[in-house]
Amino acid sequence: MLKLRSVLLLFAAVSASSLGVQHSVSAEATYPVVDLHVDLPYQLGFHGKPLRQGMGQASLTDLRAGAVVGVVLPLFVPHDVSPTGPRKSDLEDSYLRVLGELFHGDGLALPGCGEAPGVQTWLSFEGAGPLADAPESLDAWVARGIRIVGLVHTEHNALASSSGDSHPVDYGLTEAGKVLMRRAHALGVAVDVSHASDRAVSDVLALARETHGVVVATHSNARALCDHPRNLTDDQLRGIAATGGVVGLNFHSAFVVRGRAATLADVVHQALHLVRVAGVEHVALGADFEGGIRPARGVEDASHFPDLARALRSAGLTQAAVRRVFSENALRVLCRSGK
């Protein structure tokens, strides 16, 4: 706990200095931010956009303006990379591209938890299917900086069924998925259920009661407010909280509200519901910037995090609660993961 408190103090100092936040700005606008899901590696791998640039939602300039002190960068390999599906070599290529960018120049740093200046970064898997036939290889990936393992992405794989696959079968967590999840939790790594089907989420939460590991949803919202399969039921939210995990508030309009373009007020409504159901210690930020999303109006890019902070304060959250949601809860998971 003492180390985590020191990290938070360091991040607070960074957010007011090297990230370019003016000391004259109201304290309400300078809450340090840790975002659990920023798809800059996707832009790098498939559009050739440097990590510092992206497509304009989470550029280094936007991150600095939003007082972002840490981001989780997901490594993603689509199923159509090769005729036989994603391979571990494809994952290696993705990792090496990201690593090369992180150590080229300044502004982004690996690893996180205060070991280096700049915007701290952690790595996650978004769809760990390539590891299904070699779960022991996860050990090496954790040594390389992986702190969160998302078992599945938008299509079913050998580990779990997806909420986004066009085939309606929902087979849940497979035996291979259970093996990998047990290994992840043995290594102290959190398991991510964003993109997992309902049955898969239930299976993961059930197994977590045996493994005593942390389950997170890095970029998902409440289904009670927006009935979308990518969102979570209240029971699922409570189940994640019971593991000590967090749910990352997603800014994608289609996951915030149904039938119209979402606004900042709708994002606040989602945040308040997550806090009420999961508890303030189990809500974080996972905006999903750079992932091909249409952000809600008022939070179009990372520079608008201070606007969200002010809106949450106006809606009744205390400064301490906003600090928890904006960084402390995420850091609790990330800085203990892999240990």
Where are these regions (language model features)?
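Bacterial N-terminal signal peptides
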Residues: 7-18
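A short alpha/beta connector and helix-capping loop motif
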Residues: 202-207, 211-221, 299, 307-308
